[in-house]
């Protein structure tokens, strides 16, 4: 047998037994990585020598590239060397790196070097470091080596490389033991990693580096808080270090823009503002808020895929009855919210300036304000109200209405209003910020003025403005109609005469243009995600661009011959758009347009379509066609005839109907005979007696071959069907009349499988063929 044979040596083993070979010859051998994983003694002994280990590490971290070689081969030896040093099946190579003096010096020199890395060497380095940090052979020896180097400085200088960014993000996840995790956290604390990240954000000159630094900070924070939510011990020194008030204040100060700051300086600072806002947003997002407005709007389920940390921060308390888990918060004192709320007036001023200057900073800042509005903290909402008064907030609404196509801006502002209106506090108080918007803030009056004023802009601009204004009104209307509405909110609205008129306008608009709004997942006013803006465009944005293209399209262009297989052109029908009435009557109806765009392509009506090519001629089709033409109209027997006192009942099956009518028994003394061209009887008398399946042996009259349309076939005996098919087309298929040895003429059914009325298999088969709809429902 094959296992009794001696194992043949491969080319690598034969090479190691010779005297004239080099390390390069070994690395270029096709079996070197495979045999290294297997731990071949001869190969391990050769590689783990001091000079070879140093050479492998030098090849991985400081390769000398021959530019004369093709690009594919320049880093070939470096890649193979890094693969050997990071083999998972054994610790022997990694242990040699941290215990051999030559390799230790090589690694220290590399980490202390300030030369920028390229993406390939960064990948080799990240892979080696991950293997070293995940091994348990001697953790203290590994960290004692790293503490002598400028590891974090080296990584932060090359943070723009994806491999380095991932290495820092996963640093607290790499160790496989709790002791290893503790050592890594102590190392990060001693090196002041978070302070270095924030300082590097200010010093960096490229926008990409700022974004990568913010992402590293956020990922480490999410990982720490994920563990805090599920661990019994809620003490984490590294998390406490990240929550240092001085550090948070330094991050928040990056959002401050002086009033006299020129537009050019604001553009230069936009990347720093966006990165800082992203970090503060992660702090607020991962701090659990009981009964948050986003939960009331049923938005959390949609964010489970992208917002991974929510599985512990928000969904876990919903599934766990442990009161301690309900009350735990990583930031119970709301430190981040307080620091940010104190700077909110300046942040709102920056948002307004950036919107008017057509900048990009308003988007991350508004997302940060949205998270601040989703906190259910009275002190925070009081500071929000103060900031709204100082701006005032209605100026943001007016600036957004000056940009009717800015759907993302509209969506974010609507979310701010929604979250404030749905915030819940003890004693059923209304958010001070929401109260300001509904009273002295002038939000209702602004919505009413826009709804009742003509707009001379283009159709697209009018429709975008109309949707934004309508969504603002819907936000107030739905807060009023909530399951448990706020009594103070109801009192404010009932005392406002403008709201009474505006409510009627909102109701009429929704009745005509959004009849199924509660099921419309494209509506940005409520159903669009509070936290996830992957579909941040509102309902108007989904069709206004398309409507513009349709309006500019010449209707005659669609009447051209589109495909040679069709003898007549398409006939577009745009009449349904002319039914729009009311304000902005020159714009198409958004609901009708969306319905039209959602129809399948094959539902378009094309009059007079025919194909010029002939269909495929199947064997036996010509004979069937000639026989069918000479046959007189026949009477079709019922699918399930019943034996009743000598009277035979017949029933019609309508051609193409696809639905079978159960057999009936007429009154005594009557016989009902229905032809194919007759009318279906209105009354059917159902016999409750046991059915008789003796008719299964009867062959039906010949009909056109419906190919695979079994819904219009009568239930007949498989034997009869096989005989009929064989007799009608035996001359068309070669060899059809020749049977194998032992094969009956009705193969695959022989005499022992004749159909009987008592055979349960035939009963089920007949029922499934005659009533496919019933069987599918069952």
Curated annotation (Swiss-Prot):
Superkingdom of origin: Eukaryota
Keyword Cell cycle in record: yes
Subcellular localization, as worded in the UniProt entry: Cytoplasm; Cytoplasm, Cell cortex; Cytoplasm, Cytoskeleton; Cytoplasm, Cytoskeleton, Spindle pole
Disulphide bond pairs: none
MF (Gene Ontology): protein phosphatase binding; protein phosphatase regulator activity
Primary location: cytoplasm
Pfam families (alphabetical): SAPS (PF04499)
InterPro entries assigned to the protein according to its UniProt record, in alphabetical order: SAPS (IPR007587)
GO BP annotations, alphabetical order: actomyosin contractile ring contraction; cortical actin cytoskeleton organization; establishment of mitotic spindle localization; first cell cycle pseudocleavage; positive regulation of mitotic cell cycle; regulation of signal transduction; spindle localization
Biased composition range(s): Low complexity: 720-732
Basic and acidic residues composition-biased segments: 620-630
Keywords: Cell cycle, Cytoplasm, Cytoskeleton
Disordered: region residues: 609-642, 714-778
Cellular component annotations (GO), alphabetically ordered: astral microtubule; cell cortex; cytoplasm; cytosol; nucleus; phosphatase complex; spindle pole
Gene knockout outcome: RNAi-mediated knockdown causes severe reduction in cortical contractions and lack of pseudocleavage furrow formation in the 1-cell embryo. Positioning of the spindle is abnormal due to reduced pulling forces that prevent oscillatory movements of the posterior spindle pole during anaphase.
Subunit: Forms a complex composed of catalytic subunit pph-6 and regulatory subunit saps-1; the interaction increases pph-6 and saps-1 protein stability. Interacts with kinase air-1.
Family: Belongs to the SAPS family.
PANTHER family found in the cross-reference section: FIERY MOUNTAIN, ISOFORM D, SIT4 YEAST -ASSOCIATING PROTEIN-RELATED
Purpose: Regulatory subunit of protein phosphatase 6 (PP6). In complex with pph-6, promotes actomyosin contractility during cytokinesis by regulating the organization of cortical non-muscle myosin II nmy-2 and thus contributing to correct spindle positioning. Also required for the proper generation of pulling forces on spindle poles during anaphase by regulating the cortical localization of gpr-1, gpr-2 and lin-5. Negatively regulates kinase air-1 localization at the cell cortex.
Name of the protein described by the UniProt record: Serine/threonine-protein phosphatase 6 regulatory subunit
Gene name of the encoded protein: saps-1
């Amino acid at each position: 047998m094959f296992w009794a044979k001696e194992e043949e040596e491969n080319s690598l083993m034969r090479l190691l037994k010779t005297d004239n070979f080099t390390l390069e010859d070994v690395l270029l051998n096709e079996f070197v990585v495979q045999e290294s994983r297997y731990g071949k003694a001869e190969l391990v002994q050769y590689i783990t020598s001091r000079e070879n280990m140093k050479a492998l590490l030098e090849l991985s971290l400081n390769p000398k590239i021959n530019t004369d070689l093709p690009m594919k081969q320049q880093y070939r030896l470096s890649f193979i060397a890094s693969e050997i040093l990071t083999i998972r099946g054994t610790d022997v190579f990694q242990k040699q790196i941290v215990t051999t003096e030559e390799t230790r010096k090589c690694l220290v020199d590399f980490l202390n070097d300030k030369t920028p890395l390229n993406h390939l060497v960064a990948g080799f380095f990240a892979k080696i470091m991950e293997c070293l940090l995940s091994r348990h052979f001697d953790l203290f020896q590994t960290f004692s080596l790293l503490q002598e180097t400028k590891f974090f400085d080296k990584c932060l200088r090359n943070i723009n490389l994806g491999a380095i960014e991932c290495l820092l993000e996963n640093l607290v996840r790499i160790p496989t033991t709790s002791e290893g995790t503790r050592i890594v956290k102590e190392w990060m604390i001693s090196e002041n990693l978070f302070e270095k990240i924030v300082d590097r954000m200010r010093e960096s000159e490229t926008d990409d580096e700022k974004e990568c630094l913010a992402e590293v900070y956020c990922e480490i924070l999410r990982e720490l808080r994920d563990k805090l939510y599920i661990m019994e011990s809620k003490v984490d020194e590294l998390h406490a270090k990240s929550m240092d008030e001085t550090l948070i204040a330094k991050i928040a100060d990056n959002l401050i823009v002086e009033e006299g700051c020129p537009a050019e300086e604001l553009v230069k600072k936009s990347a720093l503002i966006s990165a800082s806002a992203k970090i503060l947003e992660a702090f607020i997002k991962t701090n659990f808020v009981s009964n948050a407005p986003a939960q009331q709007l049923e938005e959390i389920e949609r964010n489970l895929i992208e917002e991974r940390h929510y599985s512990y921060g928000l969904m876990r308390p919903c599934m766990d009855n442990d009161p301690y888990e309900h009350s735990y918060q990583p930031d119970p004192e709301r430190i981040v919210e307080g620091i940010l709320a104190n700077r909110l007036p300046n942040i709102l001023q920056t948002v307004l300036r950036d919107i008017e200057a057509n900048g990009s900073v308003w988007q991350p800042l508004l997302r940060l304000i949205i998270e601040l509005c989703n906190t259910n903290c009275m002190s925070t909402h009081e500071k929000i109200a103060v900031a709204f008064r100082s701006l005032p907030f209605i100026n943001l609404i007016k600036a957004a209405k000056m940009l009717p196509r800015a759907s993302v801006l509209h969506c974010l502002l609507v979310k701010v209003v929604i979250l404030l209106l749905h915030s819940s506090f003890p004693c059923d108080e209304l958010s001070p910020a929401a109260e300001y918007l509904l009273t002295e803030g002038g939000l209702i009056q602004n919505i009413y003025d826009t709804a009742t004023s003509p707009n001379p802009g283009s159709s697209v601009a009018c429709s975008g403005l109309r949707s934004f204004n309508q969504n603002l009104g819907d936000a107030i209307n739905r807060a009023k109609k909530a399951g448990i509405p706020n009594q103070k909110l109801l009192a404010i609205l009932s005392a406002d005469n403008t709201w009474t008129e505006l409510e009627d306008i909102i109701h009429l608009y929704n009745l005509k243009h959004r009849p199924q709004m509660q099921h419309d997942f494209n509506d940005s006013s409520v159903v669009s995600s509070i936290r996830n803006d992957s579909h941040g465009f509102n309902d108007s944005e989904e069709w206004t661009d398309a409507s513009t293209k349709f309006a500019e399209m010449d209707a005659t262009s669609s009447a051209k011959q589109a495909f040679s297989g069709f003898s007549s052109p398409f006939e577009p029908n745009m009449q349904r758009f002319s039914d729009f009435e009311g304000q902005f009557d020159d714009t198409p109806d958004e609901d009708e347009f969306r319905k039209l765009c959602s129809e399948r392509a094959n539902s378009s009506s094309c009059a007079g379509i025919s194909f010029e090519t002939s269909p495929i001629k199947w064997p036996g089709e010509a004979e069937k066609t000639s026989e069918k033409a000479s046959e007189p109209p026949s009477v079709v027997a019922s699918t399930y005839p019943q034996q009743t006192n000598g009277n035979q009942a017949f029933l019609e099956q309508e051609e193409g109907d696809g639905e079978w009518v159960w057999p009936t028994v007429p009154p005594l003394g009557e016989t009902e005979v229905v032809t194919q061209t007759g009318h279906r009887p209105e009354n059917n008398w159902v016999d409750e007696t046991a059915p008789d399946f003796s008719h299964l042996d009867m062959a039906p009259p010949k009909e056109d071959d419906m190919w695979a349309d079994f819904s219009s076939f009568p239930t007949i005996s498989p034997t009869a069907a096989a005989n009929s098919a064989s007799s009608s087309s035996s001359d068309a298929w070669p060899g059809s009349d020749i049977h194998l040895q032992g094969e009956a003429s009705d193969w695959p059914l022989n005499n022992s499988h004749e159909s009987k009325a008592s055979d349960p298999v035939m009963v089920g088969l007949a029922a499934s063929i005659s009533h496919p709809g019933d069987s599918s429902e069952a």
